[in-house]
Design a protein with these regions (language model features):
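N-terminal, polar/charged subdomain of small-to-medium soluble alpha/beta proteins
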Residues: 1-39, 43-71
Length: 71
């Protein structure tokens, strides 16, 4: 599942370096991309969240921590 989440984010966010850790139904996601330049912290998180929204709404993932930064 970690690979699927990483691949979804990499497909949606250009030139992203992505790290995903999943333990049970909790995920920790770190994304670094120049794509985030000029975005607010909330907007960056929304961009990542959109990639996995279906996994959260289905209950597969319950708690998600997102760290999104520019290089």
């Amino acid at each position: 599942m970690q690979d699927e989440v990483r691949e979804r984010i990499e497909a949606a966010i250009p030139n992203a370096r992505v790290q995903v850790e999943i333990e049970g139904n909790r995920a920790s996601i770190a994304v670094i991309s120049a794509h985030f330049d000029g975005m607010s912290r909330v907007k960056k998180q929304q961009e990542v969240y959109a990639c996995i929204e279906d996994l959260i709404s289905s209950g597969f993932l319950h708690a998600v921590t997102i760290k999104a930064e520019t290089p």
